[in-house]
């Protein structure tokens, strides 16, 4: 960190997003990078053509440029996306959560949760205060409007699950993650199930 900006907006976004994610983990959890041993955070941008995705490949971040004609912006420009993918690296280093079935849903939820956390850290001015807004609970709202997923109301995307049922492990992990995402939202913010599937008010 600390280097001058380049002329490439997406290089700058990946650089700043990775830096903010590192800072958030360090400030709140005293974690030194994804391996807790100071590993460098490496990113590649402009991957492929019309590629609306980003991923952790086991050693570094990879960002597509999106597909603007279909409303998908360059992936490096989403702070929660960067933190989400880097959290996959943390999970890879710290847990045995395989990337399939119910375990995969928890893996994805962990990334969404820390994506939201890091966004709140940045919105709080990176001062140690978390600023939470309606956008905090939207995943990828800066990439594909109105959002990719909704932690406070997972079913709003038309696919994510918001309560446990038998066989949920057969659902795409990006959608089964909604169960843990909503649990985290309710634990941190309080309230009831957004679609009336429980009568318990979490306080």
Language-model regions, residue ranges each:
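Surface-exposed extracellular loop regions of Gram-negative outer-membrane beta-barrel proteins
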Residues: 85-91
């Amino acid at each position: 960190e600390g280097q001058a900006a380049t002329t490439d907006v997406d290089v700058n976004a990946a650089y700043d997003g990775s830096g903010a994610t590192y800072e958030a983990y360090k400030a709140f959890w005293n974690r030194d990078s994804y391996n807790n041993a100071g590993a460098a955070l490496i990113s590649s941008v402009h991957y492929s053509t019309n590629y609306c995705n980003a991923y952790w490949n086991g050693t570094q971040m990879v960002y597509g440029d999106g597909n603007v004609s279909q409303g998908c912006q360059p992936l490096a420009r989403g702070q929660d996306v960067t933190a989400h993918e880097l959290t996959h690296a943390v999970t890879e280093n710290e847990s045995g959560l395989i990337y399939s079935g119910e375990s995969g849903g928890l893996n994805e939820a962990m990334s969404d949760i820390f994506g939201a956390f890091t966004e709140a850290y940045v919105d709080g001015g990176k001062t140690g205060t978390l600023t939470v807004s309606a956008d905090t609970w939207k995943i990828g709202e800066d990439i594909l409007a109105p959002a990719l997923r909704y932690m406070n109301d997972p079913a709003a995307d038309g696919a994510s699950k918001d309560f446990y049922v038998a066989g949920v492990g057969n659902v795409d992990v990006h959608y089964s993650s909604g169960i843990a995402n909503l649990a985290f939202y309710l634990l941190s913010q309080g309230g009831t199930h957004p679609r009336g599937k429980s009568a318990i008010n979490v306080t």
